[in-house]
Amino acid sequence: MKIADIQVRTEHFPLTRPYRIAFRSIEEIDNLIVEIRTADGLLGLGAASPERHVTGETLEACHAALDHDRLGWLMGRDIRTLPRLCRELAERLPAAPAARAALDMALHDLVAQCLGLPLVEILGRAHDSLPTSVTIGIKPVEETLAEAREHLALGFRVLKVKLCGDEEQDFERLRRLHETLAGRAVVRVDPNQSYDRDGLLRLDRLVQELGIEFIEQPFPAGRTDWLRALPKAIRRRIAADESLLGPADAFALAAPPAACGIFNIKLMKCGGLAPARRIATIAETAGIDLMWGCMDESRISIAAALHAALACPATRYLDLDGSFDLARDVAEGGFILEDGRLRVTERPGLGLVYPD
């Protein structure tokens, strides 16, 4: 079960539905695809989608971290020593979380294939399936409502709405959306760090009035002090995203009084399944719910996140829609989307079907 070859390439993915969030617009993305082959013929897959605005990792830095010459230490290593390999990934690539994540998930894929089981079973399944949200970017009211109707028609019952920080615009969109949905879907909101303290208090009043599920990352990432100054009831409705990169952040956020009630884990922020599961353990111990999110990603890494999410008892929310709007992808399988719910396949490993 020794590693015989590692190949990395860049794939360009146009989006079928470009969108805007508080700090940028997104029309296309690049992912790095990782293939790790063992001497006995197994193929493990990983994908990296670095997000410079969140982690500081550029596509160029990610590519450099995955340069073939820098991965020589993995050649000949036994995949069954997975915990040690993941530990070494963190030591060798500390500033490249997306690169680490791609290698980490490919190694997990291989180990689960070696054992002949879906990865979620190796990790310890806690859920069979969960509903995922789909994201509506920042756009005019009528376009927001039209997109919401499209998602409802496709069976989705959880919508995440991006906010811009302009209260008049944000509140009008949310009120009109509430009227249009008429109880047919749950709404959660994501200001992407665009609110200040007074604005958040006004937003929270609207959240309670409209029955909105929670608020994701209202404040700038460094303002944990603003979060802790909020009443406990409001903090419980806050999900930390940009404030939560790795396990150290999770530990700090969970320290009493907990700064939030929900952790949004993303493999591209934390560096893969191994650190994600450490974050999950901290959350479960502290009584914090888990949300599993993503960047715009190939279904390879979405599948990896889903396997991890379904193996954590504290998982309450999924926001794993990152591959839905790709105009094309490099793999199939990995998960099944049905009536807005995600479940993994019964194939071993990540369950992906890949043209070899």
UniProtKB/Swiss-Prot annotation:
Keyword Repressor: no
Keywords: Isomerase, Magnesium, Metal-binding
First-tier enzyme category under EC: isomerase
PROSITE patterns: MR_MLE_2
The keyword Isomerase is annotated on this UniProt entry: yes
Binding residues annotated for substrate, in chain numbering: 135, 160-162, 266, 296, 319-321
Family annotation (SUPFAM superfamilies): Enolase C-terminal domain-like, Enolase N-terminal domain-like
Binding site for Mg(2+): 190, 216, 241
GO molecular function: magnesium ion binding; racemase and epimerase activity; racemase and epimerase activity, acting on amino acids and derivatives
Identification of the protein by name: L-Lys-D/L-Arg epimerase
